[in-house]
Amino acid sequence: MSQDQESPRCTHDQHLQTFSETQSLEVAQVSKALEKTLLSSSHPLVPGKLKEAPAAKAESPLEVPQSFCSSSIAVTTTSSSESDEASSNQEEEDSPSSSEDTSDPRNVPADALDQKVAFLVNFMLHKCQMKKPITKADMLKIIIKDDESHFSEILLRASEHLEMIFGLDVVEVDPTTHCYGLFIKLGLTYDGMLSGEKGVPKTGLLIIVLGVIFMKGNRATEEEVWEVLNLTGVYSGKKHFIFGEPRMLITKDFVKEKYLEYQQVANSDPARYEFLWGPRAKAETSKMKVLEFVAKVHGSYPHSFPSQYAEALKEEEERARARI
């Protein structure tokens, strides 16, 4: 295992980072993005009405993915201000009586949990950009605060958002200190960002396109790809909050990185174009991994798509024989 692939080691940073809830604009932007993108139950990677995606569960061990935060270290964060603590204490005094079971997420207003989830997504991406993984203590202190009993629910939902929208897995890299890191999904090693560029990973968009290509028979016309992306709020030529200008990203950046091939459809007049998996996508991930992602979006299982499952299984068997 290379040094870059080793799990980040949890240590303390003497320069404490403060992440204040005064960043309400960023939280609002994240909340808006979550509403408009992949978590919609109508996300149409394949035809037909879709079910809600199932709750995330531990996946069977695969190869260790390339970390988006390749040199992360842990950090202890401070609370935003004494006034926040006072506000929190006041909220506790104003909270429902102890006789009410507030540990059940169903007894908490949906908008309150949604705000915590959106804020946690924003917080985790911020820590990742700072090359610092996330500790449970950080999340409880800065994000969850008086909602500790709902920690598991909030973390689960934030993890699903990071997975489906940004193409990132939340991994507990140190069970002793409950230290977490964000890792690119499906074995991919490119986050869709140029070197030194500030922003968030664009891997989620790449995974969608790879999924559309596979589900359409290993080649998808440009019209088919944009039909899916349009329904997730991503439009050609229109800057997207997360993905920037998506057409440039898909037809130039992903092609340059050899994740996609973009070519003219044979004998088309007027010229039409199509997408195929590029050599880097074929080398780093597999049809089965992509199918598992598609199935999760649909709230089903890989074998629910018989032809694609048979094709993916055949590829797995061929790769296994090649390793012998």
From Swiss-Prot:
Cellular component terms (Gene Ontology): nucleus
Domain MAGE: from-to ranges: 113-312
Record key words, sorted: Tumor antigen
GO biological process, one term: negative regulation of transcription by RNA polymerase II
Bias type Acidic residues, positions: 82-95
Alphabetical list of SMART domains matching this protein: MAGE, MAGE_N
Feature: compositional bias, Low complexity: 70-81
A Pfam family: MAGE
Source organism, top-level taxon: Eukaryota
Biased composition (Basic and acidic residues): 1-15
Positions of the UniProt region annotated as Disordered: 1-22, 39-108
PANTHER family (alphabetical): MELANOMA-ASSOCIATED ANTIGEN B16 (PTHR11736:SF145), MELANOMA-ASSOCIATED ANTIGEN MAGE ANTIGEN (PTHR11736)
Protein name: Melanoma-associated antigen B16
Organism the protein comes from: Homo sapiens
Species lineage: Eukaryota, Metazoa, Chordata, Craniata, Vertebrata
